[in-house]
Amino acid sequence: MRKVQISVRRLVEFVLRSGSIDNRMTNSDRALEGTKIHQLLQKEAGEEYVAEVSLKLERIVDGIAFSLDGRADGIINDQMIDEIKTTETPMEEITEDFRPLHWAQLICYGFMLAEKSDLAEVTLQLTYYQVSDKEVKQFQRVMSREDMGAFVDDLLSKYVIWAKASAAWEMKRNKTIQELTFPYDNYRSGQRELAIAVYRTVASEESLFCEAPTGIGKTMSTLFPGVKAMGEGKTDKLFYFTAKTITRQVAEDALDEMRRKGLAARSVTITAKDKICFLDERKCEPDHCQFARGYYDRLNEALFDMLQTEEAITRPIVESYARKYTLCPFELSLDVALFCDVIVCDYNYLFDPVVYLKRFFAEGPGKYTFLVDEVHNLVDRARSMYSATLKKSLVMQVKRGLDSKKNKRLLNAINAMNKEMIALSKKLKDLEKTIYVQKDELGDWNASVLKFTFVAKEWLPQNAQSESQADVLELYFESLRYVAIAEFYDERYVTQVTRSHGDLEIKQLCLDPAFLLSEKLKLGSSSVLFSATMRPIDYYTNVLGGQEDTSRMIFSSPFKQKNMHLLVADYISTKYQMRENSMEAVVDALYALASGKKGNYLFFFPSFLYLQKVYDLFKEKYPNIRSQKQETAMDEEQREHFLENFQAGNEESLVGFCVLGGVFSEGVDLRGERLVGAAVVGVGLAQLNHESDLIKDYYNETIGRGFDYAYQIPGMNKVLQAVGRVIRGESDCGVVLLIEERFSADRYRALFPAHWNHAKTVKSTDDISREVTGFWQNR
């Protein structure tokens, strides 16, 4: 007999959902108050109230053995079950039949309690808490065990077709996984060891931090053992998280390679809502978008069609079915993900506290494996995801657009926010500062933002045709994020108030996201965090939520060391105060590198301003070398054109001037003769700035390594990534020139990977020319 496990919430929502997508009605309760209100009401209910009770039910329907689980908010006197729902809807609009899905969930819990405690009937209590007015309204029903059982069986019978299809698919999938062998004839150096480590991590339900240099084949080395473990029941789903679209494509290719070897596995790639939306102006409301209108009424038919036909559900496949059934492509990709074995998506679908995949993670941990690629990017991304900003300019924009006679309540809320901002602006003026920082929250300001979200939530659906709708909605979502982040605020945060260019900005700045990331990683049963550059690995383990006993592995580069000639020009200082004086020496060193062999080169600089100055001098002094430079805010077409010029058969040399840490310093794959050399000017330190200094101060106070954590290590990682553009394959050869005296200092040499231990110091342009010429003559 087939066994199917499903939560009450998922069962109810899947079977009974109907109607349209409407962003104005988005359920922000969790973002607004989290579990605080639940805990408050549970505490006030008295000693007879037992809070957060786990319930389970085994039920056989149409040959399927269902295992139903859920968590009731409370049980009173062993025979009344309570379900708490927070809402911003005015209390007078909340009737007994306000949300039928709420009763459906409660009936399921009631039957589970009746079965567990052998009760003939159960009192069902639905408790609504109106967040803005802090009022409570309760409804009660008494239902017999028999009636509740019939209701649950009816739900399960409607889900049976999906359960049987999923069970049949799982059996087919597991059979192909058992027969699946590694898709390539041979393992690359280090690849088998990495695959074994990943498999053991998944099987033992642990975490692994791993540096796997370019060439090992880390995508296949993580996905293949993950798939094998899934076939043995050691994990239910694989999530492949990454920061870049191109890396998601690599994951898709690896899955396709396994499919060519016989694997049957469903995968979906989730594309960002703004990118995949069919509309010129995204507005997720039924009155505006035909793909949102009636979405849930058409969804299940589309899902069934897709699941009968597709395995590799990539963006084009999602778009095709979305158009066929007139469905929002973004929501369709999320809904089909519930039936997929592998989900390929951006970091934020796990780590972001607002946009994370609630259908997987809102109810607590699951038997999931998290494969997190390019984790060197996750540090800054995590700080950004757990920080939040509001600007006075947006508040005033909304205020100016509202009719004071028609929108008094909303304007009162906005005026309260503006009043707090005026007070903060005055404080800055009195202090004669443009930036003010404090460790504690701004309590009155936060309260005004929270109040605005309540009022705006009520105003938006009632004023759908208002010219101010878009502005209010923007401020509403920004405020929701701000309030959501306020829930995490602790000693790892500061509040920063900045006055700049006539605007006032209030920011909750996350200095250390490690604890928050570790909590997110606990939502899975196993995790592997990896990158080509994770040096020193203890730093990444510390800042990305690892523990002292978390496993760590560092693999050697699979490429021959002799294929990359590494030169360190430590006779030049590019420190900020020395740049004007050393600029000509930098230009001469770059020319010495590029003139040693006809070919294509990339030169990396710490800022656009410095890049422009060196570029201008280089063009003036060496006009015979063809050159191009990265521009600010290049679109995708411009970036592609920039890279298309790097061809193996170019008749003359080409040098590209790029920004370190920018779009061309990682994720760029110019193999063979398309790139024969690179230079990195400087050690990658960000310009001194207030936020980095706050991070430095925090880590100085906590572990005594402020400069390392805020400046040196992040900067050196940019260097490592840029150098990684040169050797992309086993037969690639190239020269790398590091220009900066600090590259010879012990604190930087300690961050060199093992395959850089052959670095050679050069003391002049003549040395560079001689080394470059000699290297190429010996190839």
Name every feature range the model reports, one short phrase each:
Residues 1-80, 100, 104:
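Metal-dependent nuclease catalytic cores that hydrolyze phosphodiester bonds in DNA/RNA
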Residues 57-152:
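Mg2+/Mn2+-dependent nuclease catalytic core
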Residues 168-211:
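Conserved pre-motif I regulatory segment
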Residues 203-225:
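Walker A/P-loop
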Residues 318-343, 354-361, 458-573, 581-582, ...:
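A contiguous, basic/glycine-rich beta-loop/short-helix subdomain that forms a polymer-engagement track
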Residues 570-581, 631-743:
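Conserved RecA-like P-loop NTPase helicase motor core
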